[in-house]
């Protein structure tokens, strides 16, 4: 019986979990270049995280242990089986667990954490141990995860109730032909009495054995187990042993553990005080007594840093270099381990971590030495945690060899000397978390995972390099840590890497990312070599003919290089022979082509490694840009064998004539020569006219040589003499020399005279320039001859023009001028001139050479410091004119306000500035001017200032702020009087200087230094110059701010998203800022102080120049805070802050302008709109239509904007995270009102129509008689046809029934792919919306979450008030702007919000329906119209009410016949041809989808290779030879994955169909390729017949390749066509929206080619739109409709019978139906409606037409399936028949009636009888009391209360309250009950509460 219970549980879990699972293939990891596609498997539930992973070493199957699930996956991570392990009702305190005996503890639904997952290979089973029921295990069959046994009835079966993964490890040991042993170590969480920490257990081959998991040995004296003593727990309350890894090697089993150290006699009760040690534990395999237990600490060090906290480990073989370093063989085992630094904080280890290696031989040697020393009696056993005290080693003469397994003495044995490993690699940033290793080509390759989701690839070489990281790839987009378990695929091409929510298959190498030989072979990746002639980096086994010489380069020295002679030629040199030598070349005998960039390609002549090529001809020579003298391009060699360019070098074309000067010509990099007499540069020296005129060295060039500075006063006539070299003598007919000067843009040409080859003189001339603001102007000049032949000026000699008077208005400034200008002061004219321009008789001319020269008439123009303290020390700056020509003239002659002021030599500026320092003032001195003398105090040398200098006494009043952080950096403001006086100020906090920042007359600002005396107050003192200001002020140093938490821990690359920072003392920071550093660049953003514990910040951008649009998640190199001077937070380590890519938006339309109707939603499509972050925070979008915001709903790929009521054209702007996008504009076109002429025309037309109607009525009477006769005749015709096809129907039905039985043979009801309740409800309530806000937690931007939640809880009270809710709904329905869509939305939101209170929701619904009936009858509408359409909130609420309450009935009863009908339709349609273009089929219930031609076809059986295991039997698949390749792929996928939900299958578009002919030949079949037949402008899709595929052919579905064998040459045409028809079969992500996807392929109008399959579209072109429905259907087509109808009849009958029956396989009628029908009857009685037709119609409109028709037409609402267009058309016919069956009106049929009505004309009367009987049976059932109904509703509420987020639903409903607040408040104020309950006030209070945050 128990076994049967296990079996049922396993099968149920298996099927149900697979149905519920959602698997996606995502772009995930990013290598160093690009974004490779990795196979990925995702967690089905965000909270059910992955724990363990293992790969079967023979089959390659991947097994994943997770919370509540164990999965079996294929090698490419597609799911095969999901085995349910939880959640279950449990309590950790129940011991024994409740599965053995009842438990009195409170039970809760508890997750089952997978803690152990091991494959028992010899018995083909999987051991999976969890945390439920005290840690019981299951043995699962590897093939299907069927439970073989779940031992749980003995205490030995309870391993540990610890619900944390990564604390347990197990090792299976088995000898040939014997039962196995399971060594298992686990943490026990203080329950040492219940669970041993280490044990050895039996693992019998028979799963039913009673000894399963028993201890190997268990007696009163000795057992195969070790328990933690209670004394140890008393001493260290948090003591536990965590088992990180285990393995068997040789005759031993090893465990690697982390455990707290146990200090001698000192109790430790705080986990934070613990020191941890990592230990190796060794046991002999065959030691049941555990006498061989030895435990030694282990770890490693580098550069003095100890790494002692074990994180992960992996046992592997060493590569050759590593084996040599360890002095071991390559066959021995090496342990690779990851450690974190130190011994503290094991549960939050530091980022500083290391990869270390330990040879097992070295570990065993150290253990042997420890054993030997102990058996020699040396020291203690050193295992205090287990023994409780120091126990001396016992001396015993026992020989101890390598296989010693202990005695009953000296055991268990510990040690304190650690086993030290070899440190291969360390990192201080991104903590290492996992490790795996294997040997490739003699190298140890180690793969290390990190906490940010990156995978490091390290080549372990041993000393001296240790381990070299050669690549790092980002595996997990969200930055999740890589978990401990990693495993290789069986072919070692892939590594399986796991995070908490994702498993990813990563290739072990990505050689293809390297594009050059140098990159490839310097990458350090041992997998990679250079495949020479294929010009690619790859593994050796991927390179063709790699064994041949130089075909595959394994070291960088083997890279090919190309030498070319000559390596450059002139552009005028054409078709030259070039000699190329290829170094390290493979055999090139198959031919070489030489390519000159993209200019030309020529044949090369090969001779060994030498190639002769011809340079380009005249037409192909490149054009060299005007400003360059050469142009380089790639000279490439292309292999004719591979077609690839395999080596290249730069080749240059040069142009000598680009050089205009001799020096640049002869100094160029090319062979250029200068023709001196022709003044040109040429590559051919023979073109020079004179032999002596040829120059090819710079020394021979004509050129000017340096001379003394050329100074010319403006206006002076002077010659300019220049030195030169090699000046040419002008030849006959050539002009002479000139000097050309460019002065302020004007060119002056002056004749020049050549004296000889080394001298030339510009003739006498004067020069001028404008302006007195320039005293000295450097002028460019050149010497030319023969008009424009320029002499080189290599030193860039210039002529300097100058004016003495410019900028020298005073005597002092004049005499201060540089002596070389020879300027002086002309006293009489008071100006600066040359001596010759000053009349010597009337006025003296002063210059530096004059004796004792002094300038008279000094003047003071300004004093800069005009006040200071009387104590002196103030520096006064004096500006003026003629303030001396030497410091000695003013050194003792300055007084300020009567006080001597000492000039400072270093600050003196001749004639312009004096800076002096004030002396001490006599008491009583108040103010005065500055007085000074120049040299002597005569009147002409004396002056005084107009400004007064004042003595003041500074004072201090207050300080702000009065406290700051200990690290300093606070801006301190000191206020007082006269604090701006003096020239310098100093502020001291205690004995430290406060760094001066700025001051005004009444305040000083300075920056506080770090405290030198710790925390507490310090005195504040101020000094101004020499004055000390008394003060009693104090400044207090307090603790530096600390940051505890950042929420959320993500942003987007542009930043500016809100962050909330929580911590301590945050208010002491004046200008807090947040910073990130990425790629060496820092970015900062602002923060605002909220209070002492909270800051709000805007996230910084990643970097200012970060490229947008990259779909990568980045982690900044540094993240921290700029908090004054607090250095500890500059880099904040306790965060995993990541950046998601920026959102991007597509244009609204190609033109950028979208035409909209008023009220229509605007859909903005984009990418990365919802970052996949945990925690609920979302991006805050604001969308503006013009200046008006709109309501926004966001999903991953689109943003829905409910626009305001606007007309005209408006720009759309999207604001998010500091970015602004404009995807275009919307043009809203309002429906214009009718004009007067239009109204008159309508009235006239109406009158005419009335007359026509009267005439038609008369004619109708006459016609109806004829119709009766026609109907009888037509009915007879149908009967005859039906009898003729009866036999065909029986045969077809029998065949279909066989197929359906095959399809459903292993489908019991639990196997039907039902959607889960939440998905089902969402598709009914909110069709087409995948990610609705009600599915997730409420998200509020900023820090308003609590306020909004509080307000919404107030709103919940209002919603739960019936008076309010009814008033709210009625008010909304009265508003004209409250659209039909709004009504449906509000109804669905209310039902989701009241999901937890269905009793109340039902009460409200009944009241609304009652109101609706009243209103319907008051308006004199026909009663039968009630509930016909969804025009009120009540009607949509009724649909949703039934959807909630009939879900169980759907799953238990109605779902099965509906699913069978769907399967039957799909199977029957696919038995005949289906046109891939038009969607028409041979077998159809719909005339519109019927092929109207005779199509010849044949059924084939194809044998398909099993895609998951090519060695398993082939799968036979029925197809038609006229099927397109895509149709064949769909049928194969249906056959291979017949029991797999549609969303979890591969897509046909992602697969290629291979036709396998023999063992080698494989042909890829495609809908279009180069063999596709094209006739005129028609192109026919390829079919199996086209490829001549025969019966029983072998085919295979393989993942689509990037390139194919037979892609057509006309790629542009075919690609368009293919994409169009591919999309018709593509699964779009959600299994069909409301509108079915019609597989119509639009002909390729752009290219003029039309695509067809079975029927050309123009075959029906002559039929007008309405003809099909109205014409008589010809017999042959009607026969097919009848045949299909007859074949499917049983399935339609089964469905209708189930829906119209009150008894279903023992299940009672759903209470909801009886309850609602009784309510409608009560309403009819209340209104005295006794017409049975009206009551019948109400019930039909209420349930069958409102709910069941929707489900029949859309089975994808209930099941995880794909509904094709032909299936959709047939279901629509069935749904119409269902509707007709519920109608009370008589169906009058004629020849013009639709074919589907004619088709079921005979059946509808009997169906109507079923309906009437059904309604009558329900009426006879006993009434349901309100009490019973409420109990049922309460139970339903409890079951699904958590499916939707109530606060989110309320928030959505509130948007309508906000929109119609005035109308709602008005309605509440008018309602008496609402007034009594003050509801209007409560609504106003709610609006105020919500508006605080908005």
Swiss-Prot record:
It is found in: Cell membrane. It holds the Pfam family TIG. Residues 1259-1894 are cytoplasmic. The chain crosses the membrane at residues 1238-1258. GO terms for biological process: cell surface receptor signaling pathway; centrosome localization; cerebellar granule cell precursor tangential migration; limb bud formation; neural tube development; pharyngeal system development; regulation of cell migration; semaphorin-plexin signaling pathway. One of its GO terms (molecular function) is semaphorin receptor activity. The modification Phosphoserine is found at residue 1612. Residues 1261-1310 form a coiled coil. GO terms for cellular component: collagen-containing extracellular matrix; plasma membrane. InterPro entries: Ig-like_fold, Ig_E-set, IPT_dom, Plexin, Plexin-A2_sema, Plexin_cytoplasmic_RasGAP_dom, Plexin_RBD, Plexin_repeat. Its main location: membrane. Homodimer. Interacts with RND1. Interacts directly with NRP1 and NRP2. The PLXNA2 homodimer interacts with a SEMA6A homodimer, giving rise to a heterotetramer. This is Plexin-A2. It comes from Mus musculus. The gene is Plxna2.
